[in-house]
Amino acid sequence: MNAIRELLSFGSVVVVATCLTSIAVQAQKSSGSSALSGTSWQLVKFQGPDERIFSPDDKSKYTITFGSNGRVTIRVDCNRGSSTWKATAKGELQFGSWSRTTAKCGARSLHDQVVTEGAAVRNFVIKDGHLFLSGMAAGGYYELEPVASGKR
């Protein structure tokens, strides 16, 4: 009888531990836990599929912040947007549907290039402290640097 109680007690502990582990793993996945989690970046340059390079006149007008809660916010010149994000250890990056403002930006704006190509980003890598976003079908990539503390 004691052996049965001990076996049942042990079985209950295993079930509870398994459930808690599963909950912790799901929470980690949904919070966007990765090297990007809790980071903010500003655009250094965009190289288009035709290998032309575009650099912003003001890096602080082109920023992206990956929240640790699975949300992402962007500033693309005179517009702002938000979505959800997920990343894998293999460097795959996925965004949900974007909601954003649609103001008409100035003549020297990179808004149209960033919005058009940015929607197709599928991969990321952090190299030498810079974030590189790529994976667009037509080619090209974004290079971003960390936003200095206090400038988000």
Predicted features along the sequence, with ranges:
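Repetitive helical segments and hydrophobic/amphipathic motifs
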Residues: 14-15
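Lipid interaction determinants
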Residues: 4-10, 19-152
